[in-house]
Amino acid sequence: MSNQDNNTLKVGMVFISMIFFIFGFVTTFIITLSDPVREAFDLSYTQAFLVNSAFFITYALFSIPSGTVVKKFGYKSSIVFGLILIAGASFLFFPAIQIESYIFFLGAIFLLALGVVLLQTAANPYVTELGPPETSSGRLNLTQSLNSIATWIAPLVIVFLIIPAAVDIGEIAQAVQPNDLILPFMIIGAVVLVIGIAIKMIKLPEMSQEGLGNFSSTFKYKHTLLGAFAIFCYVGAEVGIGTAISSYIVQDGLGGGISRELAIKFVGLYWAGAMIGRLFGAISLSDVKSASKKHAMAAGVLVWAFIVGYVTLDFSVNMAFIFFGFAIANYLLMQLGTGKANKALAIFALVAAALAITSMLSTGRLALWTIVTIGLFNSIMFPNIFSLAVKGLDRSEVSLASGIINTLIVGGAIIPLIMGVVADLSNIQYSFIVPVVCYLYILFYALVGSKVKPTVEQAPTTTTGA
C-alpha cells in the first residue's frame, strides 16, 4: 500500500469514527430529550415517551431494507445518505417547533432515526475495510469507545443548551419552552452536514458484497430467536430507564431535592456507566495474559470512573466516590463471569433487576443511586446476548441473524411506551416494574434459552462464550 493510500485510509478512519460518535450522540440525545419535551409541549408521560417510539420503530421497519440499500449503493454512499437524512431531519425541527406541532416533531424524529439506522447498517462492516484485516478488531473497539463517550456527553449537552436557557425565565420545573429545543438540533444538522460533505469528497475503498442465504434457514435456531427477543428486552429496558430517569429522580423524596439540571446530569452518568462497564469488559476479554497487568488496566478505568463522576455531578467528591464504589462492584462481579458469556450475562441481569426493584421500593438517595448505576450492568448485555444468539451459525447465517437482531432493537420503541402507560396509571416509580420483567427474561435466556440445540443438519459443536 502506498503512503498516499495509507494516509487516505487514516483520514477516512477519522471521519468514520465521527460517524459512530454521531449516531451514539443522536440516539442518547433523543432518549434524554423526552422529559424537556414533556414540559415544552405539556404532555403526559405516555405522550412524551412517544419520542422514543418514533425513533426506535425505525429499527423494525428499516433494518433489513437498509441492508438492501447498502448492498445496492455501497457503504460509503449509504453513509453519506444517512448523514444527509440526519442533517435534513435536524433542520425540520425548526418549523415543527415554531408551529408547536408535536406530530411534526415526532415525524422529524422518525426521519432522523432512519438516517441513524442506515449509518449503523453501513458503518460497522465498513470500518473493517479501512485498514489491514488483522487490526480490524482494534478499529472497531476504537469506534465503539467513541460511541460510548457520545452517549455520556449527550445528556450534558441538553443541560447546557436547553435547561440553562430555561432557568433564566422562571421556575425550572415549568421553564422549558418549545423554542429552547431549537438550537441543539440546528447545531447537530450543521455539523452532520459538514461531515457528510467531507466524507463524500474523500476517496475511500468500496467494500465487496458477499451473497447471503435466506432468512428461513436462520429461523430454525431457537436460541437465535430467543436471543433476538433478549435484545428486544435489553434495549427496551435500557432506553426506558434512560428516558424516565430524570423525571423519576426529581419527584419529591426520590432524588432528595435534586434539581432538574442535576437530574439530567445523572442521566449522563447512567450512560457513562455503560461506557465504564464496556471498558472493563474489553480488559477482561483482552489478549493480555498477565493478571497483574489486567488489574492495573482496570485500576486506570476506575480512576476514569471517578473523574467521570466528579465532572458530571458538579465536581462533587462525595458523589464521585459513590459512583467509584459501584464501578468497583461492577468489575468484581464481571470477574465471576469472565470467559463465559452466559454466566456474565446472568449475573448482570440479576443485579440489574435487583437494583431496579430496590429503587422501586425505596426513596431518597438510595432510590436515585440504585436506578442510575444500572447503566454499569447494562454494559456487556448487547455483545454477550449477540454472541450467544449467533453461536453455532455459519458466516452467512450470522449476517442474517444480525439483521433479525437489529430489527428487534424496536424494543426501544415499545418498552418505554409501556412504562409511560404504567406511569400515567399509577406513578413513574412503579413503571420500573417493566424493565424488571425485561431483566428477568434476559436472566432466563442466559441460563436456559441460550443453550444451542443442534438441528437435523447440524452436528453438535463446542463453542466458548465471548
Pin down the residues of each PLM region:
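C-terminal membrane-cytosol helix-exit motif in multi-pass small-molecule transporters
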Residues: 154, 158-167, 183-209, 334, ...
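Central cavity-lining transmembrane alpha-helices of secondary-active solute carriers
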Residues: 50-68, 268-280, 414
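Glycine-rich segments within core transmembrane alpha-helices of 12-TM secondary carriers
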Residues: 135-166, 402-415
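Extracytoplasmic
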Residues: 11-43, 123-124, 154, 241-249
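Extracytoplasmic gate region of multi-pass secondary transporters
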Residues: 30-31, 219-282, 309-312
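Intracellular juxtamembrane helix-capping segments at the cytosolic ends
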Residues: 118-132, 379-395
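Conserved MFS/SLC helix-loop-helix module at the cytosolic interface between two early adjacent transmembrane helices
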Residues: 61-103
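C-terminal ends and interior cores of transmembrane alpha-helices
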Residues: 84-99, 304-317, 331-337, 351-363
